[in-house]
């Protein structure tokens, strides 16, 4: 049932585009490419290994971080914590990460993806690289994405009328290494894609 559902998802041009771009940028690296499994992935899944990994990861909640959102009193939070968190197993392990050394493509690249019959194109411009992480710079990058989204909508949609919508987003990541990413994306008609 899930295989057929995922096959239907993969038939959607937008999803196919995202997967192709991800595979192109990250060289089909399973740790960085799209999490959408193919039919071959489903056929090759080792369910026992997946279940064993699940059990191993959730056998120790001592280094988990919990975030609670909602309108609760301190007393309610205490009751919920005692009921749901205090009973979780704890082995006092400290989790860490491992930088595998993998990095995505750098430099300038162009990738064209064709899928579907609609007279529609999606343009994505991406920038990425290594940098020193800071909370301040991360907030600045996110703000830049928000501001650029407003400007893109003003210029491309409202003034030129050549796109249906536009968006930009940026962020810095601390782990597994200091990096930044910034992307601009918008759907348009094929004639306007190279403008």
Predicted feature locations:
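His/Glu-based metal-binding/catalytic segments typifying zinc-dependent metallopeptidases
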Residues: 93-151, 155
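M16 family metallopeptidases and their MPP-like homologs
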Residues: 1-7, 13-44, 61-69, 120-136, ...
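Glycine-centered hinge/linker elements that transmit conformational signals in sensory
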Residues: 80-94
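Short beta-strand/turn micro-motifs at beta-sheet edges
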Residues: 52-55, 110-114, 168-174
């Amino acid at each position: 049932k899930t295989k057929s559902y995922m096959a239907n998802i993969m038939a959607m041009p937008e999803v196919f585009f995202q997967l192709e771009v991800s595979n192109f940028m990250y060289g089909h690296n399973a740790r960085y490419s799209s999490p959408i499994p193919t039919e071959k992935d489903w056929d090759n899944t080792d369910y026992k290994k997946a279940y064993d990994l699940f059990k191993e990861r959730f056998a120790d909640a001592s280094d988990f971080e919990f975030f609670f959102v909602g309108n609760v009193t301190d007393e309610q939070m205490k009751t919920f914590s005692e009921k749901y968190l205090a009973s979780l197993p704890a082995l006092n392990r400290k989790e860490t990460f491992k930088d595998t050394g993998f990095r995505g493509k750098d430099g300038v690249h162009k990738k064209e993806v064709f899928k579907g019959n609609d007279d529609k194109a999606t343009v994505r411009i991406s920038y990425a690289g290594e940098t020193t992480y800071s909370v301040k710079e991360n907030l600045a990058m996110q703000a830049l994405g928000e501001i650029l989204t407003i400007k893109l909508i003003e210029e491309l949609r409202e003034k030129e009328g050549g796109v249906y919508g536009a968006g930009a987003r940026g962020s810095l990541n601390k782990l597994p290494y200091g990096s930044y990413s910034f992307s601009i994306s918008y759907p348009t008609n094929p004639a306007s894609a190279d403008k």
